[in-house]
């Protein structure tokens, strides 16, 4: 008797899917190979990891215009992660940005295994979530904070859910560490995390002490850097150089950060339709409602960012905040609502809607994935050094400075 086994890709569908995402990521990154990545937002990487360590311990910053401020909190993380790549730290940012989609899909699939037993829907959900990194425009814009936040968000949700269900100290510490890491790159994640922990403590009273410890750890690790931003009302939205990031309400509702490299808002329409329909089945409505609350919270953050302006430096012109992280959380919540309600399509009452639902479900990853591979992740991201001009200089008109005098009378 000869037993023919199915092909490897059919026996291991998720591994095959991840392999395909890695290949697609390399194809999409074809235009940014060869040099450290830079953009208006993403500063050029240091020539050596030792320069990141210098930022942590030197008394004043001797780069650019010079500064007496302490280094951003994310420099601590980059310094540690860059040790294995000591003489090529630019490779670290390259890996984080180019491979962000498969990385986010992997963490999403891990969380999906906790909340869904439907393999097909879970895989589609994980791939769709991973594509949020490019749909929002975070990858092509060099918004490293949003990329890190979207990659770690499913891991945070996974451990937080386990903490609420089984209150123990190891996951409480892990949650605090994740809050610190994500907030270091995307400071707006800190108030979101505090609100989330407070709501979880209200709902799950037995885990209140562990959740409080998570909040303390996440806040303490950020240290004075966080409180400096609270007291001086400085940049809250994204790591890197503060640049103008205009986004309309329609763009935020479509999951876009409003930058050049963001996808069209129409790609998200099938997802929104499915998320609204997910509210209909009563047996899954409670879980779907929780996902909708998360989604609406992200939408509020995105809309708030789209109308918020700030001066990055004293005397600098106002710039609009980056709304990509809130837009990404908005779509992530909608996707999760669909995943929660998906088992109802196997029941007799909703079985006739299975084919239309599947068609709508696969539209988002097909369109977003195809757009990602064809367009690539360059523009404005590039592999050549960008000449960065301070915002207060770029906003001013060109002037001419005339120097007269000699070595005796002096320069006037």
Which residues make up each language-model segment?
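Membrane-interface alpha helices of multi-pass inner-membrane proteins
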Residues: 171-186, 198, 217-220
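Periplasmic/ER-lumenal interhelical loops and adjacent helix-loop junctions
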Residues: 1, 54-61, 214-287, 384
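Signature aromatic-anchored transmembrane alpha helix within multi-pass, membrane-resident enzymes
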Residues: 342-369
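Short hydrophobic alpha-helices at membrane interfaces in multi-pass membrane enzymes
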Residues: 163-181, 208-212
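Perimembrane helix-loop-helix junctions
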Residues: 192-219
